[in-house]
């Protein structure tokens, strides 16, 4: 179960499964393992790091594992 609290933070509660949160430029995606569903939503309440064109070798995907 997930919800956004009064301060604008994303609270995630997971029982009995491995849970993965994926942050992609401008969007937030998360799925369960095994993947039963995938949800993507705009990152309006999260800061997004701006990648420079002079840094093409840097990964533009950040993976956060719970």
UniProtKB/Swiss-Prot annotation:
It is found in: Virion. Keywords: Glycoprotein, Late protein, Virion. Its main location: virion. It comes from the Viruses. Induction: Expressed in the late phase of the viral replicative cycle. Glycans are attached at residue 11. The keyword Glycoprotein applies. GO terms for cellular component: virion component. Belongs to the asfivirus I177L family. This is Protein I177L. It comes from African swine fever virus (strain Badajoz 1971 Vero-adapted) (Ba71V).
